[in-house]
């Protein structure tokens, strides 16, 4: 890739990964972000020049400008590049260009679990094939990075459905974890439009194999809608109707055990990640690896080394009011994700009381899923509800934190982190496990709690 490329919004995890990948593939790379952070420091350590002011950036010196969704069309650097006729590509459009440098690409998409599933497959392939690479939306714990370029053989990518940008991509393999109602403004609040976009994605000429979870209603709807016979379509799940069925799921000493029935063979696996949903995610990756020709024994040995992705069920031990307490930090922010996480906590800690500290994320999500929140938020033994993290949205009347728990009783409303800690100091002991959850800044609460 012999190009000079400027990355705008390079302090974000997605664009920073593309900048690193481009550099490792031979491009001359520079980046801009208004605020320096850990990611920009990492890029500078790799020899990438970072600008924090538009002043001094000679846009005319670049062949391509790549920008994140956080960069407005009116941004001076983007406007200048367009006026000069320089090729300007949104993040996913550039990822599509980058993919052409690789022989084979596998895209993971879905409303929930795509980052975790991408990290599982990335960890497997990096052990099974030293020339495999990945670009995903979270820090893969196995590599302590969201990006690794080991060669140009196989590439694992996370394909984002939230803004429909996955339609820019042309992979050979697609894994769909689920299809659910979220980011519906992208799809004009139409479920049929959402399904049509997924159909368009898997119908691309490049796509040869499709794996989808038949336990999910959205995936079943896609199967019913999709009728092309020129692709290899494989369903997986706990359902007896799955092409590859999962069974014998259980936990021993905090290790998840399960079996799958693959082409007439019964194959057993162990996984460090908790919950039925992670078994579903892992199964998709296992099947993809088996179909690529990797040996069962090698996949099984690689799978037990999978540790997932940062902020997905991260485990800590904290001392709270003199008690050693297990604390879990998790990114889940949708009712389905909340329910799955609480179920996983129950499976792993069946004899402990669950205290759920939840920070809702976006007023629009509160509003759009207002009927689904009460059931999900009733599943823990004790709910501590924080104010909604706005993500720069304006407050919507009837969609604040207290509105999503209407009809529930026994929950505690905290007006901030200090208030939540006050409740935790009263409630937590060795017989409790604390799930701290949300996509905003609630992860900081984990750090604030006493070591």
UniProtKB/Swiss-Prot annotation:
Family according to the record: Belongs to the MurCDEF family.
Organism: Francisella tularensis subsp. tularensis (strain WY96-3418)
GO molecular function annotation: ATP binding; UDP-N-acetylmuramate-L-alanine ligase activity
PANTHER family: UDP-N-ACETYLMURAMATE--L-ALANINE LIGASE, UDP-N-ACETYLMURAMATE--L-ALANINE LIGASE-RELATED
Involved pathway(s): Cell wall biogenesis; peptidoglycan biosynthesis
Taxonomic superkingdom: Bacteria
An example Gene Ontology CC term for this record: cytoplasm
The reaction(s) this protein catalyses: UDP-N-acetyl-alpha-D-muramate + L-alanine + ATP = UDP-N-acetyl-alpha-D-muramoyl-L-alanine + ADP + phosphate + H(+)
Protein name: UDP-N-acetylmuramate--L-alanine ligase
EC number: 6.3.2.8
Gene it is expressed from: murC
Coiled coil feature spans: none
Disulfide bonds: none
Binding of ATP, residues: 110-116
Function recorded in the entry: Cell wall formation.
Subcellular location(s) per record: Cytoplasm
Swiss-Prot/TrEMBL GO biological process terms: cell division; cell wall organization; peptidoglycan biosynthetic process; regulation of cell shape
Keywords: ATP-binding, Cell cycle, Cell division, Cell shape, Cell wall biogenesis/degradation, Cytoplasm, Ligase, Nucleotide-binding, Peptidoglycan synthesis
